[in-house]
A protein has these predicted regions:
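Short, flexible, glycine/charge-rich loop motifs used to bind or transfer phosphoryl groups or to couple energy/partner
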Residues: 6-9, 34, 58-60
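EAL-family c-di-GMP phosphodiesterase catalytic domain
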Residues: 15, 19-27, 44-137
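Charged helix-capping and loop-helix junction motifs
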Residues: 1-4, 31-34, 82-89
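Helix C-cap/alpha-to-beta connector motif
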Residues: 3-15, 42, 97
């Protein structure tokens, strides 16, 4: 992939982030860690998507040395229903581990304000932009 990006003169080093999804079990931890280090060494980064869902857990963070997590929209939506205790626990653990958090699926100003108050610095969701196809990005 890196060779292809270089061949196409597509300089995304430092800007291109890959996501480890909740449906992707890791069967070879050593190879996964080597690949993550390789990507990081070339300026590309891997983030855990939908953290605390499916296969994505604290075990991935410990074993792979990842630095970013995306909190799934299911947890963000709890803000609107006064059920955010699990979200608070996840954010607290991430902050203690010095992980960057991306709040995924932020749709309201109230969610944004509350998350910002809780120390979240990165956001994704309809409040900011609807999804775009590649040529529009």
């Amino acid at each position: 992939l890196i060779n292809l990006l270089k061949e196409l003169n597509f300089p995304l080093s430092g800007r291109l982030h890959f996501e480890l999804t909740e449906r992707m079990p890791i069967t070879n931890w050593e190879a996964a860690k080597r690949n993550i280090i390789f990507l990081n060494d070339h300026g590309y980064y891997l983030k855990i998507d939908d953290f605390c869902c499916g296969y994505n857990s604290f075990l991935n963070l410990i074993n792979l040395g990842l630095t970013h997590v995306k909190i799934d929209k299911k947890f963000i939506d709890t803000i609107d229903h006064d059920e955010e205790s699990i979200l608070f626990a996840i954010l607290s653990a991430c902050q203690t581990a010095k992980l960057e958090v991306i709040a995924e699926g932020v749709e309201s100003r109230e969610q944004y304000i509350k998350l910002k108050e809780l120390g979240v610095r990165f956001f994704q969701g309809y409040l900011f932009s609807k999804p775009h196809t590649f040529p529009l990005m």
